[in-house]
Structure formats: C-alpha cells, structure tokens
C-alpha cells in the first residue's frame, strides 16, 4: 500500500510525463504537493523501491514504470469528466442517421483513432452467440444467386454464387426452405454443429447429387463463422513505435491475430481490460486497452486501442469511455429503426 501523498505524486508523475515526455524531478511537483522537496524526494524513493517509478540514465528525474502505469490505471484514474472538445467531436462524428451497422463501427473506430492518435479496433458481440434471424435467396439471373443472411445484431452477410449445374430453381427453393426450417432461429455456434451433423443426412433425402449441395452450404455459411474487425489508424503505429515496425504492421494487418488478442484480454465480465505485459517481444513496449460497449438486448461489443506504454492513459480511457457511451446511444436508435419492420441497407 502507498500513502495518499505518494498516490498523488505517482498521479502527477504519470500525468506530467504524458504531457512533457521528460523525466520528472521533485521540484516539478512542489506546486501541487503540500510537502517539502525533501519529503517529496523520500516519497519518490519509496515509489521507486516499489517499482512504480524508475530513474532515467540521462536525468536525475523519474518516469513511470510499467507497474506504475498499471497501478495508475487500476487505482488512480478518474473517468467522471469528458473534455468538452472531445465530446463535441464525437457527437459531431455520430451526427445523423445510420442505416448500416458497419457504418456505426467505422465511425467509432475513426473517432477513437482520430482523438487518440492510436490504432483502434471495433468488434461486434461474439459471433458464436449471435442468432440467425433471417435467410433469403434471390435469383439475379438464370445462373447467379444472391444469399442474404441477417444476424440478431442487424449485421447482414451477403454472398453471390453461381448455381451448381446439378441444381434447378426448384432445388434452390428446397435448399432455402431447409435453411429456414433447420438453421434460422439458432445461434451461430449451434449452426456450426448442425451443418456437420444433421444437414448431411437431410440433404441425402432431398437431393440426388449431395456433394454440390453440401459445398453450397459450406460456401454460404463459412463466412458466418468468421468475426469481422473494424480498424482505423493502422499506420499510426509508425508514430509511436520504433522497433520491430514490420512485425507490428504485419500484426495490425492480420485481423484474425488481432481478434485473438482482443478476445483473450476481454474474456471475462470486466467492462474494461488493460494489457501491459505482452508475450510477443515486439509488443513489449505497447499497451492494449479494451472497453466493452452495450449492444442493446444483444450483448457487448468491444472498443480497443493499441499504443505506447507511456501514452496519456487519463485521456485515452476517457475517450474510450466517451465513444462507448455515444456508440451505445446510436445503437439504440439504430435498433429502434431496424426493429420497426425496416431492414439494414447492405452494399
């Protein structure tokens, strides 16, 4: 445990270092701490022994350590107030009507990246828990078909394909009815199981050439089992990272790996998660911060930013909290529209 004054000193060192990016000495703290310079130095020695601050080789001042940042985030930081300027920018970005879920997520990602200068990610509710609420097939011409899958979150997945030679339009109608009877209403995780157990047996009863029908099932629904990540500011990594840039950019461009990272640190009931110590050596000096947001009556999505360990945590977490609140508000409007017998407009 540290004393209240030591907590204030740590808070100031973290805040000042985030603004000035130079080591902080005891004289810099005198105006804000009601204690002598000697007392402040002694408290700084205690914080250093605890591993919360550390000395820079080129200066007598101190800078926060990874443990210090972690303590600050978990015990000191306050998120009660937003910057009025940040609030104005976020509200302006979300102004207007949204008719596609993807547009809301893109706006959130761009707002996060724009305000923090970091790489940002937006992730929908876990795919496995989403429900298939509707399925339609539309003949585009005598050979081409468009399948339209709608999930409970309002997300729409479309897939255009060539009708297999062995299938007629009547077969296609049977196929569509099978999907509606056996898959619509189920969660994605249950659909995955059904496609591998029940569907092959059912297909044998209705179709002469089963291989092409089973391939069609796989073609249409394979994309359903892949989560989509909305990203903004990938190139921002070059503004705050100096080592292993090629590996980092490769990671940030690999949605599947980033999905794994985000799901790994948010796999609990906490609304916010901060990961300082990463197993990957090229992520050693970076912090991953994730904030869940409410998707009304449908679960939780996730906002994530990745930046340097010495980032301004107070502002970054405040911006995350602000965007999460505004996004949830806009999602409420979106779902009221969607539930009112309207459909998401898909490209």
UniProtKB/Swiss-Prot annotation:
Keywords: Repressor, Stress response, Transcription, Transcription regulation. One of its GO terms (biological process) is negative regulation of DNA-templated transcription. It comes from the Bacteria. The keyword Oxidoreductase does not apply. One of its GO terms (molecular function) is DNA binding. The keyword Transcription applies. Belongs to the HrcA family. Negative regulator of class I heat shock genes (grpE-dnaK-dnaJ and groELS operons). Prevents heat-shock induction of these operons. NCBIfam families: hrcA (TIGR00331). This is Heat-inducible transcription repressor HrcA.
């Amino acid at each position: 445990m540290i004393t209240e004054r030591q907590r204030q000193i740590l808070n100031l060192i973290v805040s000042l270092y985030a603004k000035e990016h130079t080591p902080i000495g005891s004289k810099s703290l005198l105006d804000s701490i009601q204690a002598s310079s000697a007392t402040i130095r002694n408290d700084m020695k205690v914080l250093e022994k605890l591993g919360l601050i550390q000395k820079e080789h080129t200066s007598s001042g101190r800078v926060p350590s990874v443990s210090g940042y972690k303590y600050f985030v978990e015990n000191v930081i306050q998120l009660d107030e937003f910057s009025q300027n940040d609030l104005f920018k976020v509200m302006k970005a979300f102004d207007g009507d949204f008719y596609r879920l993807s547009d809301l997520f893109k706006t959130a990602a761009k707002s996060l990246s724009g305000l923090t200068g970091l790489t940002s990610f937006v992730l929908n509710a876990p795919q496995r828990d989403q429900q298939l609420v509707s399925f339609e097939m539309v003949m585009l011409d005598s050979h081409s078909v468009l399948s339209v899958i709608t999930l409970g979150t309002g997300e729409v997945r479309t897939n255009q394909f060539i009708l297999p030679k062995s299938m007629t339009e009547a077969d296609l109608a049977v196929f569509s009815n099978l999907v509606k009877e056996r898959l619509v209403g189920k969660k994605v995780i249950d659909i995955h199981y059904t496609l591998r157990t029940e569907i092959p047996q059912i297909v044998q009863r209705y179709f002469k050439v089963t291989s092409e029908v089973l391939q069609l099932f796989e073609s249409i629904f394979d994309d359903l089992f892949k989560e989509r990540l909305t990203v903004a500011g990938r190139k921002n990594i070059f503004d705050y990272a100096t080592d292993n840039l090629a590996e980092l950019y490769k990671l940030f461009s690999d949605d599947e790996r980033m999905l794994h990272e985000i799901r790994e640190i948010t796999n609990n009931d906490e609304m916010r998660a901060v990961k300082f110590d990463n197993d990957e050596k090229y992520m050693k000096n970076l912090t991953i911060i994730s904030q869940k947001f409410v998707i009304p009556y449908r679960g939780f999505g996730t906002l994530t930013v990745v930046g340097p360990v010495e980032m301004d945590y107070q502002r970054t977490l405040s911006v995350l909290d602000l965007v999460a609140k505004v996004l949830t508000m806009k999602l409420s409007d979106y779902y009221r529209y969607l539930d009112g017998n309207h459909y998401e407009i898909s490209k």
